[in-house]
């Protein structure tokens, strides 16, 4: 008999070789119908896999990310099976589950797969899913796998297999389709009830631009048609909120191939928005005793060799810059932490000096594949609101609490009200890959858990998800249309202090390693602005919006009065513009509404005679007339009340 420990701490005994599905059935037949995958000692596996030893065990349903992942991974195989029937001779690349759905990269040979072909492929997928095909996992020798896929002319699969370590590899078969795959998968295609293929795109094989361009088909599936219908409604709303569209309408940022792909340029209004965000965070950080630094945009190759980033991320960096005089190599800065380690090392440190909190709005550059670039959310140059905290092991919890305060202020000020968190801890069993002492890990893990409890933050604990150098806490927010975005991370790091030989003198007069904590409430300025645009549909909080007021003279003869109104409002720190175009007032109102300006002040003969303005509020329409001073005071008070909340 083996002992199975459930998340609530309860333990049950089962026969060796029991499967996850059998365990679910032993609890309830209804549960067995709903589960999609299971977790065994931190590893997500198929429900049909036998369990042969004592294990920590969890069942995953649709509501769990692991459940969705297995569902969409199987859906990718279902797509491939349909393509195999419809396009004989098609070759397959990779087909993973992604955050929202799945894709498969294929080489259809002479055939061309267009978006007009997607409905027919969907229909074939539905036909196959209805057969409730069982997925069969098989472990075979590497040479047998090469032979099997080679006989089918699967050159892409053979390339992947040849790079695997010698030994046994796994395949999954459903119906007539067999794929090279680690899993996990559903037990059958039966749960897949609603299917939608979304787009067709090009993607270079393995992301390398000198390789074959394949056809990438994106899709999403659900266990119920109602879920798909709701998702498609959300997609339509997401198109309206696309930050690329709204950013152009509001004149916030631009891209041009002349400057380079993935290199955003911030226009005056977008720059004003960024500056306000940075000043906002600077004020908060000052309250929490952060010291701001500035580092160069490049670094010597040896810096990144020491940090380990060169070995791990060298391929994601731009080509090195060679200095002919010194014969050295420099890289565009891909991250800020190595520079901050050198700042820490610049002076001797005592335990009394800690914690040391170093912050920087540091611009970094990473070579993202052109096919992965997307507006502001995936770029090649971006600015991180980075901070690195150097502290003693006994200070980790307090530092987490302080950073959580800052992140909470950021989210509340931007009207992100639905916040989730995930604590990523070590694998419960396999701990060889982690750097740092068990004692320090246990202290840090417990500190994160206790910090979440003290703040009343509901956090999901994921074992085995920690980086090799430390546990972390990730924050996910739901936007106005229900999408989840990962914003804000607090990461413990035992690796860089070791690599850079960072030290402080302890109260025992002995040298000790500090604990390093990475944190970024925004993540990056670019991605945060993109998420904020899509969350608010461009209707930013009044204190943040680039232009708070548009003054609209009804004809040219009132332009001078409009300028006087602007000058008066400036006394109240109101950011106003004058729309003095020779256009009808209706056109001006529509255009400024599209620019999401919160207030419009219409001025004509009556307003000029009485020193007044006719007020319109975004989304609410006419608010009547006011004296200029009264409006200025009211607006200043509205902004002040917002800012004083945090």
UniProtKB/Swiss-Prot annotation:
Catalytic reactions of this protein: tRNA(Thr) + L-threonine + ATP = L-threonyl-tRNA(Thr) + AMP + diphosphate + H(+)
InterPro entries documented for this protein: aa-tRNA-synt_IIb, aa-tRNA-synth_II, aa-tRNA-synth_II/BPL/LPL, Anticodon-bd, Anticodon-bd_dom_sf, Beta-grasp_dom_sf, TGS, TGS-like
Molecular function GO labels: ATP binding; metal ion binding; threonine-tRNA ligase activity; tRNA binding
One GO BP annotation of this record: threonyl-tRNA aminoacylation
Cofactors named for this entry: Zn(2+)
Documented EC number(s): 6.1.1.3
Pfam families found in the cross-reference section: HGTP_anticodon, TGS, tRNA-synt_2b, tRNA_SAD
Domain (TGS): residue spans on this chain: 1-61
UniProt family annotation: Belongs to the class-II aminoacyl-tRNA synthetase family.
Function field: Catalyzes the attachment of threonine to tRNA(Thr) in a two-step reaction: L-threonine is first activated by ATP to form Thr-AMP and then transferred to the acceptor end of tRNA(Thr). Also edits incorrectly charged L-seryl-tRNA(Thr).
The protein's name in its UniProt record: Threonine--tRNA ligase
Organism: Phocaeicola vulgatus (strain ATCC 8482 / DSM 1447 / JCM 5826 / CCUG 4940 / NBRC 14291 / NCTC 11154)
Encoding gene per record: thrS
